[in-house]
UniProtKB/Swiss-Prot annotation:
Residues holding heme b b566: 97, 196
Main localization category: mitochondrion
Needed cofactors: heme b
Bilayer topology annotation: Multi-pass membrane protein
Organism name: Akodon aerosus
Primary gene name: MT-CYB
Protein name (Swiss-Prot/TrEMBL): Cytochrome b
Note: Heme 1 (or BL or b562) is low-potential and absorbs at about 562 nm, and heme 2 (or BH or b566) is high-potential and absorbs at about 566 nm.
Length: 379
């Protein structure tokens, strides 16, 4: 009798992707975060669907509809906090996933890497439009400030901003379209994630040693399904602790106040996971320059495959580049910290130094260290 999972047209796809997939035998827990991102996406879509059943995308009722969800809907408070903190868990997993890709040289699989960058940008867009929906003070002013950055584009900037707003300021039209975007984008992310997996399975996964493991692969199931399951349980534990014990720790207190266009918050800032890019934006005195630096802070990830000249795969045997890599990680933490501080001395200066260091590390220091290490190998 033929094995159904190997012959059925639909089950065959699942089988080749999650059951009989040849996998390197030595991939560590850092490889768990891809599956965790899939779980985060599913949690966000499901909780978001239930929130959308009770939310109203109207400026007069949006804030009170969120309060209604928390107070009157059965377990509405739990769904809302799982969704809000689920976004934070999503970005934690995303940053670790990208960091692992840089450390172990996964960017050599260029199609997978580039689809990943598109996924990163789409996720950031989804999170941004979602942050506007509760219509609190920081939601409103965050939307105003960030969308207004498009006015820096020469000639078409002003028209483009009004086109996105649907009027002359952030108002009802803006909220309605942001809700529509926030609803559709996760499904686009899901489609891109499948393409991401498709390209990954064309080449096979990388591994910590950076060596070819074709001769020594093992089936994905049961070895890595059980490993992923443990990761998922730990992720759910962390998410439940966050949502049940510290639900507002990552939020902004200003969002407990309904949006008021006549009253500006003392310090406008986005969610914590955008602070590194926000610092880079603020560090450049010129508006257009700041916007370009903001975009480049993410798109610079596409430079990794182009700037890679190393004869070794990954950083496991490369101590010089390892040091530079961890400097980059600390630098990103500094950028995140500065983004949450007011625009005054010494924070502005620290932010400018950290922004310059961020780009210098990736564009200059890493390629130079590659060349030095290549020459050391020849000795």
């Amino acid at each position: 009798m033929k094995i159904l999972r190997k012959n059925h047209p639909l089950l065959k796809i699942v089988n080749h992707s999650f059951i009989d997939l040849p996998t390197p035998p030595n991939i560590s827990s850092w490889w768990n975060f891809g599956s965790l991102l899939g779980v985060c996406l599913m949690i966000q879509i499901l909780t978001g669907l239930f929130l959308a059943m009770h939310y109203t995308s109207d400026t007069t009722t949006a804030f009170s509809s969120v309060a209604h969800i928390c107070r009157d809907v059965n377990y509405g408070w739990l769904i809302r906090y799982l969704h809000a903190n689920g976004a934070s868990m999503f970005f934690i997993c995303l940053f670790i996933h990208v960091g692992r890709g840089i450390y172990y040289g996964s960017y050599v699989l260029s199609e997978t890497w580039n689809i990943g960058i598109i996924l990163f940008l789409t996720t950031m867009a989804t999170a941004f439009v979602g942050y506007v929906l509760p219509w609190g003070q920081m939601s409103f002013w965050g939307a105003t400030v960030i969308t207004n950055l498009l006015s820096a584009i020469p000639y078409v900037g002003g028209t483009l901003v009004e086109w996105i707003w649907g009027g002359f300021s952030v108002d009802k039209a803006t909220l309605t379209r942001f809700f529509a975007f926030h609803f559709i984008l996760p499904f686009i992310i899901t489609a891109f994630a499948l393409v991401h997996l498709l390209f990954l399975h064309e080449t096979g996964s990388n591994n910590p040693s950076g060596l070819n493991s074709d001769s020594d692969k093992i089936p994905f199931h049961p070895y890595y399904t059980i490993k992923d399951l443990l990761g998922i349980l730990l992720l759910l534990l962390a998410l439940m602790i966050l949502a049940l014990f510290f639900p507002d720790v990552l939020g902004d207190p200003d969002n407990f106040t309904p949006a008021n266009p006549l009253n500006t918050p003392a310090h406008i800032k986005p969610e914590w996971y955008f602070l590194f890019a926000y610092t880079i934006l603020r560090s450049i005195p010129n508006k257009l320059g700041g916007v370009l630096a903001l975009i480049l802070s993410i798109l610079i990830l596409a430079a990794f495959p182009l700037l890679n000249t190393s004869k070794q795969h990954g950083l496991i045997f490369r101590p010089i580049t390892q040091t530079i890599y961890w400097t980059l990680i600390v630098n990103l933490l500094v950028l995140t910290w500065i983004g949450g501080q007011p625009v005054e001395y010494p924070f502005t200066t620290i932010g400018q130094i950290a922004s310059i260091t961020y780009f210098t590390t990736i564009i200059i220091l890493m390629p130079v260290s590659n060349t030095i290490e290549n020459n050391i190998i020849k000795l």
